[in-house]
């Protein structure tokens, strides 16, 4: 069984010299901010984390934190992600994180939590299709309840990574 980590500017892995039990790393490429303008942002540590993982000869995947609530936003996010990862050595899956459950006055009034289940399914199917078209192996990271209530049985050709907030996660293959 393989063991891996997820790293980002929010969740730095401090010691890349102590990775004897780590086989792969997922580096956050970027995210859509859940502010009112839903700004797409590059993770400020993407290139550093990506290069450190390559230097340590780890298998590398990436992830993007989606806030898409319609197909136009999903298209914009996927194009943004594809632009970030083009020409990168990605030999592990590309994870789309579907966990936007923010909905307050401060944040954008539309969140994935409040999106119609059929529309959210359509968004995820679009994201999977686009990643497949570009030769990537997509994985969807989401809450267990969202998986059971929205995706289970409706998307069968990919893996899901169910968020249980642990530091390390075991092989997703």
Regions found by a protein language model. Name each.
Residues 1-32:
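Boundary/entry segment of secreted carbohydrate-active catalytic domains
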Residues 25-28, 63-66, 97-98, 141:
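Conserved beta-strand segments of the P-loop GTPase G domain that flank and frequently precede/overlap
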């Amino acid at each position: 069984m393989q063991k891996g980590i997820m790293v980002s500017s929010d969740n730095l892995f401090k010691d890349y010299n102590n990775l004897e039990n780590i086989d792969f790393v997922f580096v956050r490429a970027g995210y859509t901010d859940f502010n009112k303008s839903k700004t797409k942002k590059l993770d400020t540590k993407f290139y550093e984390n990506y290069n450190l993982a390559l230097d340590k000869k780890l298998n590398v995947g990436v992830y993007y934190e989606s806030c898409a609530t319609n197909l136009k936003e999903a298209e914009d996010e996927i194009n943004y992600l594809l632009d970030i990862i083009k020409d990168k050595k990605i030999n592990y899956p590309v994870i789309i994180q579907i966990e936007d459950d923010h909905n307050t006055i401060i944040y954008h009034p539309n969140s994935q939590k409040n999106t119609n289940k059929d529309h959210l399914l359509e968004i995820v199917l679009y994201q999977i299709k686009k990643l497949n078209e570009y030769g990537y192996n997509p994985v969807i990271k989401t809450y267990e309840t969202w998986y059971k209530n929205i995706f289970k049985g409706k998307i069968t050709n990919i893996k899901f990574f169910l968020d249980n907030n642990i530091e390390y996660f075991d092989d997703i293959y």
